[in-house]
Amino acid sequence: MKNTMKIAFAGILIALMFVLSWTVLGMIPLGVASATTVFIPVCVGIIFFDDFKYAVVFGLFFGIVSLVRSFVPQGFLDPYFQNPIVSVLPRLLVGIVGYLIYKGLTRLMKNRIIVSSLAGGFIALINTIFTMGILILVYFQDVNQTFADNGFSILTALKTISLLNMLPEIAIGAILTPIIIKVLDKISNKNLN
């Protein structure tokens, strides 16, 4: 794929992140927090481009989208994401670590569909782990009090977030990512299976 086409397609994926973040398809309010599908363009970008620089860019823009979106909160944890350490840093790490996971998977197996599915699931998983981990590291006392004010213990809240956010996000990432990659491979004649 020519460089101009790569940049244009990267721009489309980044624009898609912004569009998803402002629709119910991308940010699904669940009361405690918002489940997201905004990571799907990140998964697709990491796998389709197979380029560390692009993975960093996709992770960075995922974080910027989260930061911008936090100023119109839907869940009671969303205002904490107005801090770039909580919104941008974990998503930047998702781009970096997601790329490393993808590259590791490509060394273990050659089937691009299976690799895409596993990478999509793992990227969703690390998104939740990094985001919740950094949120709790930075704002433990505040988050603990926020949960208590809303009738939750922090442990119960984390279990709830894991069930309501993480598991569906993993499933969505594992299902949608390979479907999109397969279509893009056919379109770009980049079928590597």
Task: Describe every region a protein language model picked out.
Residues 1-57:
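Hydrophobic transmembrane alpha-helices
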Residues 19-35, 60-97:
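Interfacial aromatic-anchored transmembrane helix boundaries in multi-pass membrane proteins
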Residues 29-33, 80-88, 93, 100-101, ...:
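Membrane-embedded alpha-helical hairpins and interfacial helices in multi-pass inner-membrane proteins
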Residues 43, 73-74, 149-150:
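Short alpha-helix boundary/capping motifs
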Residues 50, 65-68, 142, 183-184:
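A short hydrophobic/aromatic micro-motif that marks alpha-helical segments and, especially, helix-coil
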Residues 55-66, 116-123:
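Central hydrophobic cores of alpha-helical transmembrane segments
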